[in-house]
């Protein structure tokens, strides 16, 4: 799996450079974002398709997610590329997205499963206390449904009173959760 991920990352970077020369910024970001989103969805679905997940496997997957998140650097806009984007295809038709150009990557804007994949990496490396914090005090509930978090817990931990307690608390929580599954 690691070799496959590295190959995909190289391919996305090559396509990014090729497309950057011929597409407006918004078209480029949408196209590259689509590729990145496909990788994120594949990683997420591969994890949820498992019957169990040992600590070593979880760490390997989390490390792969870290490698994929390095693609964030593609989505740090520079004012030159965005300003020149309307002239690249010669249309100047105003299809470019107006953006506040900061230093934060815009990856999540163009790859809707990006944050979910990043949270998955965190959950895979977390203990029960960290998962509790991520669900109740952080934004995990914005990216995962209650059932998805329960499934991840059951996938990663042996069934014991602490696991059952956390699952019960999550199921009974009033936390606003996202509506859509991967």
Language-model segments: residues:
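Extended alpha-helical "rod" scaffolds
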Residues: 1-182
